Amino acid sequence: MERTFVYLKPNAVRRGLVGEIIKRFEQRGIKIVALKLFWMTREQAERLYEMHKGKNFYNELIEFVTGGPVVAMVVEAPRVIEMVRHIIGNTDPLKAGTGTIRGEFALTVTKNLIHASDSKENFEREYKIFFSENEIVDYYLDVQDDI
């Protein structure tokens, strides 16, 4: 089983899309093993997006993601990194496919509703910014028999 880190940005929370987004993951057999609602600190945001420091959109991105509550989660399924990236769509909503979360609901590249780790290495780095190991809950998901 593979895990990945996902968080819903403040505009997803403020627009009432949390349930819709989680539903799309669960309908695909993706298991949530950690979940929390909180305000991201500037320090957390800077650690998460450290690779973008110095880019023209960096400050706007940090201000945006710390400007409202977010929902962070760790999810699990076979090939979950690839599956989640497919479900959420391209970073640019105009390039995101029809039926993807960003394709249907996102407005701009910065305000694209959701972030998901793009590799196992980034998952390992990113989830540790927000979760401790004892916050990951292992349990049996009935749909696992079908995967």
From Swiss-Prot:
Primary place of residence? Answer: cytoplasm
Superkingdom in the source lineage:
Bacteria
Q: Show the Pfam families listed in the entry.
A: NDK (PF00334)
The protein's annotated catalytic reaction(s) are:
a 2'-deoxyribonucleoside 5'-diphosphate + ATP = a 2'-deoxyribonucleoside 5'-triphosphate + ADP; a ribonucleoside 5'-diphosphate + ATP = a ribonucleoside 5'-triphosphate + ADP
Which keywords appear in this protein's UniProt record, sorted alphabetically? ATP-binding, Cytoplasm, Kinase, Magnesium, Metal-binding, Nucleotide metabolism, Nucleotide-binding, Phosphoprotein, Transferase
* Active-site residues, record numbering mapped to chain: H115 (pros-phosphohistidine intermediate)
Q: Which PROSITE patterns does the record associate with it?
A: NDPK, NDPK_LIKE
Record-level GO cellular component terms:
cytoplasm
Under Gene3D superfamilies, the record lists: Nucleoside diphosphate kinase-like domain
**Known HAMAP family for this protein?**
NDP_kinase
Identification of the protein by name: Nucleoside diphosphate kinase
Native source organism of the sequence = Thermosipho melanesiensis (strain DSM 12029 / CIP 104789 / BI429)
User: Species lineage, top-down?
Assistant: Bacteria, Thermotogati, Thermotogota, Thermotogae, Thermotogales
The gene name on file is: ndk
